[in-house]
Amino acid sequence: MDLADLMEVENGDHSINQKHVQITFFSKDEEIPQIPDAVFDVPTGAECDDMNLLLNKTIEANDGAWKERRFEFLVGETFLRTSLAEFIEEYEVETETILKVECVIGIEAPKPLHDIQAPDWVSSVQIANGHIFSTTYGGDIVIVDRKGKETKLAVNSANRLLKCISIVKAPSKKNQLDGTEFVVGGENQLLTLYAIEKGALVEKLILRGHERAVECVSVNSDSTRAISGSVDTNLKIWNLDASDEATTYEKEEEEESAKKRRKKETKTKVPMVTIGGHRDKVSAVEWCPWNSGHAFSCSWDHTIVEWDLELAGEISRIKGPKSFTSIDLHPKSDLLISSCTDAIPRLYDPKNRDGSMVKQSFIGHQNGWVEAVKWNPLDTNQFVSVSTDKTAKMWDVRSSKSSLFDIHGHDDRILCATWNEGLIATGSADCTIKIFETA
């Protein structure tokens, strides 16, 4: 039975009267069994559901144990989201030869989980150990769990615009909040390391050294070092070990007031190393996944730089078309996804020394620019992007011209995003944090 027959049986469609195109299926996905090397004569009115029907019946005929699954279909670098006829017309696909259709395992769309009201614009967001941590332009630190319950913690950051957060340590006990440590940075040029102890927020370290607002911070995998970037164009490396005296800052003059004496109880540290090299503000920093002595930064000077932190020197530089707003390196594939002050996320291979060559550009956002991109740490193909166009998009790197899913809900531009523990969290200028569950 061919697809025209199947479509007529399943849907009552008179597919036999439609134009036809010849297709063949293939897959690079290890989860998909060997697909018969057959050519199918398919009506151009066929859509994804029809193609799924044909492929599942074909596999089942060769594998009696096969259980029906949902597939996504790629033609070239674009997911099939319409009928074949519409797709062929829109993308001017050549139909004189056999059309090769790639099959990938389908996934469910992200499900809205929680909509959290924040006191101000949301500037950054992270997920760790069953909790979502975010900062705001009003200086607030908002913490909610997977159930949407907020933990109220007093934060001594009134009138201090916060821009970034990075988790330092998460407790070994699942979903526990006590014992969590994180570092935040903002407009007052400082970074502060906090710990949650017995339900209270405790200031553990002050990191002093930047001369202008801190834009970004990232902690390494063993929680011993942090790297930060600033509007002052510099990167600074910090030792997070409170017992380390080499980078401890001691004020020479005697403190006079009791308030100042209390403040002195929080140890202040200066940077281990300062690295200059950017010509404009540093917008994002990330530790290198394959070399703990290296890090990456991006800047409004249109560059992404890989640094040797021990030598405080540049290793390689990627030149982009616009000011970069964010980067993220996948822990498994080592590929780098980036966003700029335009509507296009771009994929680079930083191990390729001709790194300025873009591997892939992803077209889909409208107007404005992409504020942030974040990989799915469990899948080397998937990432999320958020934009000033008020949308988030979930992408598969195998399709550059159509996103997997569009995620709507925000009423103003989206400023930050993260993806971890099966959750996507986005923060916006509409003063909300939206949490979505992914399959």
From Swiss-Prot:
GO terms for biological process: maturation of 5.8S rRNA from tricistronic rRNA transcript (SSU-rRNA, 5.8S rRNA, LSU-rRNA); maturation of LSU-rRNA from tricistronic rRNA transcript (SSU-rRNA, 5.8S rRNA, LSU-rRNA). SUPFAM superfamilies: WD40 repeat-like. WD repeats lie at residues 117-154, 160-204, 209-248, 277-317, 319-358, 364-405, 409-439. Keywords: Nucleus, Repeat, Ribosome biogenesis, rRNA processing, WD repeat. Residues 248-269 are annotated as: Disordered. The keyword rRNA processing applies. Coiled coil: none annotated. InterPro entries: NLE, WD40/YVTN_repeat-like_dom_sf, WD40_repeat_CS, WD40_repeat_dom_sf, WD40_rpt, WDR12/Ytm1. GO terms for cellular component: nucleoplasm; PeBoW complex; preribosome, large subunit precursor. Pfam families: NLE, WD40. Required for maturation of ribosomal RNAs and formation of the large ribosomal subunit. This is Ribosome biogenesis protein WDR12 homolog. It comes from Caenorhabditis elegans.
